[in-house]
Amino acid sequence: MPFVDTSTLPVIERPPGWHRRYFHSTHVTFAHYDFKRGSSIHEHFHSQEEVYEVIEGELEVIIDGVAQIARAGLVAIVPGNVRHSVKALSDGRAIIVDHPLRPDFG
């Protein structure tokens, strides 16, 4: 799988306001999201390290109780097993990468 055309991947809305297309490589899960202002991802944690790369718009990312605004040029890195949540402050797009891959994604 050296190339993936993400435009051909099915779109899944989960949670409401977050539309994702995702795929796995051997060791990593990649998720391309379109998000709507006001939508959120509840506080949670998982064993994977997670990286949020905002392409357009702004997200409030809370990592272990500390809030920061993620926007183009500012990447949020969530260590594994650390509680985090996300709120969309605007409409936008982001790429979220998990390592190792998330077999539960789907």
Please provide the spans of the model-predicted regions.
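Ligand-binding loop in jelly-roll beta-barrel domains
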Residues: 80-104
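Short acidic-glycine-tyrosine-enriched beta hairpin
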Residues: 65-80
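Short, conserved beta-strand element in jelly-roll/cupin
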Residues: 34-36, 46-61
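A cytosolic small-molecule/anion-sensing beta-strand core signal
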Residues: 55-56, 71-72, 90
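Conserved short histidine dyad/triad with adjacent acidic residue
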Residues: 15-16, 29-46
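A short, N-terminal "cap"/entry segment at the start of jelly-roll beta-barrel domains
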Residues: 1-27, 77
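Structural motif
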Residues: 29, 51, 58-60, 67, ...
